Regions:
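Accessory nucleic acid-recognition modules appended to NTPase machines
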Residues: 1-132
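C-terminal helix of von Willebrand factor
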Residues: 183-194
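Catalytic cores of nucleic-acid endonucleases
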Residues: 144-185
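Short catalytic-loop micro-motif centered on adjacent basic/acidic residues
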Residues: 117, 139-142
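Active-site beta-strand-loop-beta-strand hairpin of nuclease catalytic cores
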Residues: 131-139
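Short, hinge-like loop/turn segments at secondary-structure boundaries
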Residues: 63, 134, 182-185
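Short, flexible loop segments at the rims of nucleotide/cofactor-binding pockets, characterized by
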Residues: 20, 142-144
Length: 194
């Protein structure tokens, strides 16, 4: 539980048992992790091998990200002070988007989605999330600012021949055909806007 902020703050957000205790293995913590999931305190977002529907058919059993039930709780676990929050963009620099990803995960779950994520076997591309949507898959890239670059997302869309990909950021709504930008504040409407 206490390792969650550090796990999410890493560039590669895949959950690593070795970060809990040197040499730790999944079996050492699987009961504790299951307890946290059973009580709805954390949510497991599995890694998938392909962005194809249904996503559950492509889940890796060992690769996953772990998200807290609530952005505020993650902030408290992280020792996030009101001064940092009120300082604006500095909070996103400090956590490299982890709070933003937490927020998006929370919104996707609230809308009844079951998010997953994809990363290439070579490690050169990753989608922050992917959801089943109207018989296909919507990959999502989360940006904590107005950065509109989406290299990994474009790679994923081309590789899996997806008709629609979503980037969410502080920028306004923008439909560029295959790629649509949904403002972070509106990500709860992904089913209607994508």
């Amino acid at each position: 539980w206490k390792s969650l902020p550090g796990q999410l703050a890493k560039e590669n957000k895949k959950f690593v048992y070795g970060a809990l205790r040197p040499g730790a293995r999944a079996r050492d913590f699987e009961e504790s992790l299951q307890w946290l999931m059973d009580y709805g305190i954390v949510h497991k977002v599995p890694r998938v091998s392909a962005l194809r529907a249904p996503l559950t058919s492509y889940e890796y059993l060992s690769g996953f990200k772990l998200f807290c039930i609530d952005t505020g709780i993650l902030g408290a676990l992280s020792g996030l002070t009101p001064a940092i929050v009120l300082n604006g963009p500095a909070v996103f620099t400090e956590f490299k988007g982890s709070l933003t990803e937490q927020y998006v995960a929370q919104e996707l779950l609230l809308q009844g989605n079951t998010p997953a994520y994809w990363s290439s076997s070579s490690g050169n591309a990753e989608t922050d999330f992917a959801v089943d949507h109207a018989g296909t898959v919507l990959p999502l890239e989360v940006k904590a600012a107005e950065n509109l670059k989406a290299k990994s997302l474009r790679i994923a869309c081309e590789k899996f021949k997806l008709e629609r990909c979503v980037r969410t950021s502080l920028a306004a709504y923008r439909d560029e055909g295959t790629l649509v930008n949904i403002p972070l504040w509106e990500i709860g409407q992904i089913d209607k806007l994508a």
